[in-house]
Structure formats: C-alpha cells, structure tokens
Amino acid sequence: MSLCRLLLMLAMCCGVSRGSQTLPAGGRRGQRRRDNSAQWSTQQRPEGAVGPAPLTDVVTAAGTRTVPDVDQAGAVLVRQYNLVTSPLGLATLGSTNALLYAAPVSPLMPLQDGTTSNIMSTESSNYAQYRVQGLTVRWRPVVPNAVGGFSISMAYWPQTTSTPTSIDMNSITSTDVRVVLQPGSAGLLTIPHERLAYKNNGWRSVETVSVPQEDATSGMLMVCVHGTPWNSYTNSVYTGPLGMVDFAIKLQLRNLSPGNTNARVTRVKVTAPHTIKADPSGATITTAAAARFMADVRWGLGTAEDGEIGHGILGVLFNLADTVLGGLPSTLLRAASGQYMYGRPVGNANGEPEVKLYMSVEDAVNDKPIMVPHDIDLGTSTVTCQDYGNQHVDDRPSPAPAPKRALGTLRSGDVLRITGSMQYVTNAELLPQSVSQGYFGAGSTMMVHNLITGVRAPASSVDWTKATVDGVQVKTVDASSGSNRFAALPAFGKPAVWGPQGAGYFYQYNSTHQEWIYFLQNGSSVVWYAYTNMLGQKSDTSILFEVRPIQASDQPWFLAHHTGGDDCTTCLPLGLRTCCRQAPEDQSPETRRLLDRLSRTFPSPP
C-alpha cells in the first residue's frame, strides 16, 4: 500500500471520529427529555421570557417552587378517611337475621361512632360533588371462643339507598359484593371499582335537596347476623358485643365551577354561649350564625310551597363536647346524636336571629318542630348554620323564565283543547267549503288551551289566518257561500270529544282522511265537522286534538315557472342569460356548466 493511500485513510478515520464527537450549534447536552406520557390535569399557560405576561418583574426564591398559574376549575381534592364503629351487638336478644349496621356510603358517614362529626363537617363541605374512589370494609370480631351458632355477613348494594325488607341469607346472596364469616373470623371486603362508578363515573352530589337519593349516595352497606349467638360455656344467649366495622374510604371531591362552594357565603360558623330554649311552639336557639339568613329575601316566615323542599330550611350543625351530650334529652339525641338538625329562621321579640329546630327536612316543611321539656344550656359552643339547599336568591339568581309561545305560533305535536258552548248548524254561510254540517261556537265564548305550553286565551283573541305550524302559515278556505274566510288548522286523525254526558269521537265509515278545525278569519267562531248531531243541537263540549304539520298537499306549493326563452324571470336573477329549460343544443355555455356541476354534486339515483 502506498504512503499516499495510507495517509488518506488515516485522515478519513480521524474526520469521522471528530464528527461523531462534535455537537452541532445549539446542541441538546444537559437538556431534559420531555415525558410524553405525563397526564396533565390542567392546562398551564405558556411561560414567557420574563413571566406569564409582558413587562412582569419576576422575583423568585432559592429552593422555593413557584406556584403555577393554572385554572383551578375542576381541581380534584383526594382524601382518605378511616372510620370505625363502636362494638356492635344485637338490639333484640335471641333474634335471628338481625341487622347490626346499615349506612349509605356518602360524606354523611360519621368520623367517629357516638358523634356526628361526619365527613361533611370537614373540608368536603366546600365541594359540590364527591366520588368514592375506593372502599374497603373490615370486620373485627370481639366475641369469645365459646360463642357460636351464628354467622356474620357484609354486603354492598351499589344502586340502592334503603335496606331490604328481609335480610335473610337469600337477600344477602342477591348481591355479588358480599362476604359471609364464621363466628370469631375477621373479614375484609373490598368494593369493586365498577360497583362504585356505575353511573356518572361515580360522581355524586354533595347536596341532598332536590336530588334523587341514588344521585347522592354510592350505595348501601349492611352488616347482618344470621342465626342466634349462643354462649356454649354458660349455655345461654350471648348478650355481649360481636365486633366492630372498620371503613377505609378514599374520596375525591370537586367543584363544577370556580368558587362554587358552600363555605363562600352560605355557611356561617359562630362560637359563643348558646342555649336551646323550650317553647310551646317548638325548640329554638338564638345564634349569630343565622343572622345572614334573616335578611335573605328567600327566607320567608311562611310555609314552603310544593316543590320547594329545602328552600327556606337551614342545616344547623352543633359541635358539642361529649360531656354535654350526656345531658341532652332523647328527642335531641335522636337527631343525629344531637349534633345535626334542621332549622327555619324565625327571629325573636328582640330582633335577634333565632332558629326553630327540626328533626328532618320533612318536619321542617310541615312545621313539626322538636319539643324539649326545659331549656338546655350548651355553654360556649360552636353553632354552624348553612343553607340546606344552597339556593339563595341573593347568591345565585335564577334565570328569567323563557317567554311563552304565542297561541297562534304552533308546532307539530302541540295539543289544543277548545272548550265552550257549540251549536249544530247546516247554514252554508257559517261553514267552510266541503263541510256540509258541523258544530259552530262563538269565538268570544270558546277558550283555546295549548296543553303543551300552558297558554290559554279566547279564540277571538288570535287572528288565525296568520297562525303558523312549524313556521308554515295555515291554509285558508272560503265559506260555502258568502264572503267569510276560514283558517284551517290540521289535526292528527279525529278530534276527541269531551262532553258532560260522555267522551269519544265521531266515526264515519270509510273516512280515513285527516281532520281539520276551522276558525273564522277574525276568530269570532270555531267550526269542526260532524256528520250528525249526536251531541245535540246545543252542547257544552270540549274537543281535544294534536296539531299535525302542514303537508305540501295542504298548502299551494308551486314549481318555479320557466318560460324557456331569454326573458325567464326565474333564471335571470340567477345570472343566466337564457332559461335552463331549453334543449341542450340551445343552452348557453354557463347554463351547461351549471347543470353539469349540479349533476356531479347531486347525482341521480341508480
């Protein structure tokens, strides 16, 4: 090998080696690769050179992460709660198939047995929706080894909110989320995720007013005893506790819009000396926590109307010491151990904010307050008043209702009811064409009621010749004789007749055509066809019919008129010099191009 060739090969190798080690301009050494698998829950704004906005001075701190500027709408709070009950025993000794514990899975579950410091009384009250992401239930037995003759079952119903009427073993096995335990055996039941998220991906409403129960709870959990616990050592019925139920629940909480929280305005908490006063009209409590609700225009002192359940009703939450709970009357202890009640603001003689207490929402609606035998001094305690419905007029104004559709603006499917006194006539001047006899009613006494929109008015208040059905003007016909004109309103089939003596419809043999209801031009009369006076010469009658759409055969639709020459009034406005209805050899070039384009756009069916 010559020396020149050897030097050339060495130069090529060195060049390749240097090229592989040299980074191009703007190399990526030291830069982190972007993780394309990351799931972004919020959309972060792009960062500029000096900050999120121009001319923003940025001051950072070493070792401190800047809070990102993101939209918090829909941010999800994740919390885990571990709840445990007191030792559970049979309420009725010797009973079988008894219910030890039953509760809907929701934020209203108590944080500790014996109190109602529930999940809702914590930060979850600031959110609108919750979702049970995971739920594990554990049974911890406390029975001695000598006790037997029974079994424990834990069962979960994902789509129910009430306990079954029978809790025998057949009912327990009707759900596939269950476990049956022998005496003294500990158990663990993990609820499958698909059972917790069976609707709306598991999201449930934190609010309970005007919300179906299945939309405010994730399901029902039941712990039952089957058989009779028997103490073989004493040869008698076992009367002690059987065990405890331990919950491990993982919750997700979210709001549907920023600031949509109960704690914003509608939840007021006051710590002060409080006293529940006994009154012949019901127990009351004077608290500054209710001052905000006294001035609300929605919180009237009258009774709630139908459909207004939850409006005008407060949730009154007490945070009392356990020592005080021992002195509460049983009537208060039944209301969530005396810590959560409902109230309605009443105000006292001194103008102080006062709330009347109730056991439930239904009692508050029906004004059936709690009765206590004497005043109860709560000492310095915390009372929280929150809007049970979270529907203040001041806080969340309701949108104005949409205006009603006018009676003459009809849609197909509208149901009209025409009521009044009618007379059977055969006078041609009072009847439209093709109607030889029928019932005639004066428009001032005939009431027309659109049952779909709720609009009701006399027939004479509408110019029926200008009425429309789905935007199409109704057909008008002349009278059989004379100058009267009638507006013809199409109906599906035969109008139903409702009279004082009976109901039905007129049937004419071999007549299958659609019917019509006729209104005189000024609405002064209503006419409908009847081939006989079977209702009598005069009758107070109602007719009921459904409006059908106006068909092409009902309205005089005409095809466009073409002259076939250069003076076509249909084609000239379209920019064509000659009529398109000409022989192909006589058509202008732009007409042929237009027809060719139309044939490609709208091809003829095969």
From Swiss-Prot:
Q: Where is this motif: Nuclear localization signal?
A: 28-34
In Pfam terms, one family for this protein is SP2_M
Provide the alphabetized UniProt keywords: Capsid protein, Glycoprotein, Host cytoplasm, Host endoplasmic reticulum, Host Golgi apparatus, Host nucleus, RNA-binding, Secreted, Signal, T=1 icosahedral capsid protein, Virion
An example of a GO molecular function for this protein is:
structural molecule activity
Region described as particle formation: 313-339
Glycosylated position list: N255, N510
Q: A cellular component term (GO) from this record?
A: host cell endoplasmic reticulum
Signal among keywords: yes
SUPFAM superfamilies, alphabetized: Positive stranded ssRNA viruses
Q: Where are the transmembrane segments?
A: none
Signal sequence, start to end: 1-19
Q: Which family does it belong to?
A: Belongs to the hepevirus capsid protein family.
Protein name in the entry: Pro-secreted protein ORF2
Supply the source organism for this entry: Avian hepatitis E virus (isolate Chicken/California/Meng) (AHEV)
